[in-house]
A protein has these predicted regions:
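Acidic, Ser/Thr/Pro-rich low-complexity intrinsically disordered segments
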Residues: 35-82, 87-91, 100, 126, ...
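Predominantly extracellular/luminal regions of secreted and cell-surface proteins
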Residues: 121-145, 306-340
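Short beta-strand edge segments in extracellular beta-sheet folds
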Residues: 123-131, 248-254, 289, 312-320, ...
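Bacterial N-terminal signal peptides
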Residues: 11-25
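Beta-sandwich strand segments
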Residues: 121-123, 241-244, 438-441, 554-564, ...
Length: 699
């Protein structure tokens, strides 16, 4: 049995410190597929703690009974450390020590294990208020506020009741946060935890209640009618209950910010924002330092309240401005600079905002909003573009369709419209809201830019498991091409330390000289990359890396770093979250691993090309092996051909790769892997060969 060590990260961009004591001997060659489903971290309870204290936490994973925990990986500000990580029946337990000077706010926690590598992240909040742990044995539990109650709704029909004393002359805020922590269920409990919050007086009468105030999370602000004892009741809106239904109930009379205005700033520039929310005094501001995160948004908070009562804040790359009122008509339209962003909000129900966009040269223009995306603002925007005469030339309601590798809760109701300015002159964006949402939280960001070809990159998983020292595994890169980008994008894995090997690939674009094919036309959508661990690596070794894309188009050189994704749910669209860093981690071997001397093979549709394969890792007695060629496609399936058994002599063999008739001419990148589901919802290819380039010629 292994002696557990500690893996900790102190702050973003810092070095790793690994104190790993005793290694588990690697198992004999296995034939099972890599257990990607066991990588899923489902909950952390409690999901927060107070500065200067130690907290015993419980981690639940999909298969905790098979999870050999090695440590906890922590991303975020310094001041949080993990110890005594251990398996206890079907849960994993650890103690988190929070330093007295730890900065309040969120941390990302991941489990590191021998069998599966690194899990997805979940949030743990460091706060300043006293913390209370729910006692499930009590029907009612008395709490003294201000405090944060850590609870969970389990089992079905569970209703947690917390009694507290309140006075009529003191305002109160109660906020039950579950979706804010990304609390969610799996299987039959699939989806975010959706809570109902009620406050009852001594006779059981409801004096306040809420649902879906901040996203799905309920918040009530009240003054109780008389001094006395009151009860907060927290339950699931569907009367469900399960151990992963974790929440944090804030009870306070301190300011609770729920929104910031402006709702974003230019990346790399300091700014001052106004915080608004229950009990927040008018004019409360906070000055933010220059923020340089590669992610689209960060979280900001207020030191007077609990650490995870924070608000999202979006980072942009162009000039920022504030909406000026009145701007309720074309004649009073506020300025919107091309290449810039205006921070705005709907002040009252029925409010309509107008913005003037002066176009110097004819050409395509994109105008879009950010509201639900990243901000979870309650507004549903529509954009109309009008010319100087008032004629509508373009409009859009919902401009961001959802698809696999989704990073948002639902299909976003944000708007995006692209129109062509046929001549220089003023154009006007009329922005209105469709649900009646208004007030301090009804914020949005309106951006305008020249609609030039560009791209963004997403990559999954953010923790790539390498199944054994010397072995190779794949990750998938999703390419979001913008405005008819028809140039190829070079993708590369960069930042790996000496001994690790990353691959390169070219993501080719759809053009007239590259005829489309229904299933295998992955032009501009997804591409596999691979990482190979050093042969001298050990289970638990991990390293950071980044995926970079470069493209030359129209005389411009574009370069973007991929945003890594962590998976929460498996489904037709999946639910992913952007995380702060990409890592590769060595896990226990899953039987033989694969090598190839081929870096490129060439053929035409219908032809068969030979790919040399060498099997390593206890494979001396193998006389055959089933392999699958994997190629990232437009969908979730990635098996290019059916699994095929090849003969081995002294660990070497040849795989006959049949180039299908449907494959269009172009450059593709594939791996050969041990047979598995061939579906990126199940996992990634691995153990597999390093990436091989397939050049498909015209017949």
């Amino acid at each position: 049995m292994s002696t557990l060590g500690l893996v900790q990260r102190v702050g973003f961009g810092s070095l790793w410190v690994c104190a790993l004591l005793t290694l588990v001997a690697t198992a004999a060659a296995q034939t099972d597929a890599p257990p990607y489903d066991e990588l899923r971290l489902e909950s952390v309870f409690p999901a927060g703690g107070r500065v200067g204290t130690s907290v015993d936490v419980e981690f639940r994973t999909t298969r905790a009974d098979l999870f050999a925990p090695r440590g906890v990986v922590i991303d975020g500000p310094a001041g949080l450390a993990a110890r005594d990580v251990r398996l206890d029946k079907n849960v994993i337990r650890a103690t988190l020590d929070i330093a007295p000077d730890a900065r309040p706010g969120r941390r990302e926690l991941r489990l590191l294990g021998d069998r599966v590598g690194l899990t997805n992240m979940l949030y743990f909040s460091v706060g300043q208020l006293p913390e209370v742990l729910e006692d499930p044995a009590k029907d009612r539990q008395t709490v003294a506020w201000p405090c944060v109650v850590n609870g969970r709704i389990d089992p079905d029909t569970d209703a947690d009741r917390f009694e507290f004393v309140a006075r009529a002359d003191r305002p109160l805020v109660l906020w039950a946060r579950a979706q804010a922590l990304d609390s969610h269920g799996q299987g039959k409990h699939y989806g975010f935890v959706d809570l109902d919050l009620r406050v009852l007086d001594g006779s059981g009468r409801v004096v306040a209640e809420a649902r879906d105030t901040i996203g799905l999370d309920p918040l009530v602000e009240l003054r109780v009618p008389t001094d006395g004892t009151y009860t907060a009741v927290v339950e699931h809106v569907l009367y469900r209950g399960y151990p992963q239904a974790v929440y944090r109930l804030l009870v306070t009379d301190a300011p609770v910010p729920t929104s910031a205005f402006p709702a974003g700033a230019r990346r790399g520039e300091a700014t001052t924002v106004q915080l608004v929310g229950p009990l927040v005094p008018p004019g409360t501001t906070v000055t933010l330092p220059a923020l340089s995160s590669n992610l689209p948004s960060v979280r900001i908070g207020h030191t007077a309240t609990d650490g995870d009562a924070d608000v999202p804040f979006v980072l942009g790359d162009g000039p920022e401005s504030l909406e000026t009122e009145p701007n309720d008509s074309q004649a009073t339209a506020a300025a919107l600079a091309l290449g810039g962003t205006v921070n705005a909000r709907f002040d009252r129900p029925g409010d309509v905002d107008w913005f003037r966009l002066d176009i110097a040269e004819p050409g395509p223009v994109e105008v879009s909003t950010v509201a639900h995306r990243w901000l979870r603002s309650p507004v549903d925007t529509t954009i109309e573009i009008r010319d100087e005469s008032g004629k509508v030339v373009a409009e859009n309601d919902d401009g961001f369709p959802i698809e696999y590798m989704s990073i948002h809760d639902i299909e976003p109701p944000d708007s995006r419209v692209v129109f062509r300015a046929e001549k220089p002159g003023p154009f006007f964006a009329r922005v209105y809201e469709q649900t009646g949402a208004a007030g301090d939280r009804a914020v949005y960001r309106l951006s305008a830019k020249t609609a030039r070809p560009d791209f963004q990159l997403l990559t999954y998983p953010d923790g790539v498991p390498i199944w054994g020292p010397g072995s190779t595994a794949a990750l998938v890169v999703k390419i979001l091409r913008e405005h008819d980008l028809t140039d190829d994008i070079e993708l590369s894995i960069e930042g790996l330390p000496e001994g690790w090997r990353g691959s390169r690939a070219m993501n080719i674009a759809a053009r007239k000289d590259r005829p489309a094919s229904s299933f295998y036309n992955h032009f501009g959508l997804r591409t596999f990359l691979t990482i190979t661990a050093p042969e001298g690596a050990k289970p638990g070794d991990l390293t950071e890396f980044r995926v970079v894309g470069r493209c030359v188009t129209g005389g411009r050189t574009l370069e973007h770093v991929a945003r890594p994704l962590a998976l929460y749910f498996t489904s037709d669209i999946g639910l992913f979250r952007e995380s702060s860093v990409s890592r590769a981690v060595v896990a226990e071997p899953k039987g033989p691993w694969l090598e190839t001397t081929a870096t490129e093979v060439t053929g035409a549709p219908g032809e068969t090309v030979s790919v040399p394969v060498r099997v390593r890792g206890g494979a001396a007695d193998l006389t055959s092996l089933v392999l699958t060629p994997n190629l990232a496609t437009a969908g979730v399936a990635c098996a290019y051909n059916a699994p095929l058994k090849i003969d081995l002599v002294d660990g070497a063999g040849t795989f006959p790769l049949k180039i299908t008739a449907e494959t269009p001419p172009g450059d593709f990148y594939f791996t050969l892997s041990r047979a598995w589901g061939g579906d990126i919802r199940v996992g990634m290819p691995g153990p597999c060969t390093p990436l091989v380039k397939l050049v498909v010629k015209s017949r």
